Amino acid sequence: MRDKRQNSLAAASPFPKPASPLSLAAPTTTGLFALSLAIFDLDHTLITGDSDYEWGQFLIERHIVDGEDYERKNDRYYEQYREGTLDIFEFLAFALKPLADHDRRTLDAWHKEFMQERILPMIPEASRQLVDKHRQQGDTLLIITATNSFVTRPIAEFFGVHHLLATEPEIVDGEYTGKVSGTPCFQHGKVERLHQWLLEHNETLEGSWFYSDSHNDLPLLREVEHAVAVNPDEKLLAEATRKRWPIIKLY
């Protein structure tokens, strides 16, 4: 059952005023609240842009890929993602190819530059405060993202979040193959991957939170006890308003 804190944050009409992010998390007074799982989407939720798209733009800027063709495809796939029409396997064949074309040492060096130039400027202080609030409460922190783990693991580490569920690029003999390993962490795939993780870590969704900006995450938002829309897109805003989910702005 949704608690009174969430109901008090619900919309009145027709679009709710964003709630304060730090007012949402439950206190941890002994005997009143159990520790919970706090799940965060990454792109356009904890950061102000899309790390997958920005990695592509970084590759273009450095002339690592064919600029004109790659940018056209990168833009098209990004729009398909926003519209909810993305063929995830077609996209991954495109997005993971540069990983297969270069050795790990080179890729890791590029990623350090990518973090400094493109990712760190996209991390608002409010995002760090929200993650820290759940950390201080003793909650288990998890970032879940459709973007591949090569791009996102260093970002999760920057937030101090050790648990990451991301689309996994296949690795053979220490190098990327350009193929995907397992289920892509996208739409219903996020639910599948999360339930597998829950079994492996002896966790449950009791008292769980999930913060996301995207209608692509509606399957998972409907699974948790406390769904929170963060700077939501139009479709998620409509659903959050209808469901009376809290709506917050982090940037």
Residue map of PLM features:
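Alpha-helical substrate-recognition element adjacent to the catalytic core
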Residues: 24, 29-37, 42-168, 177
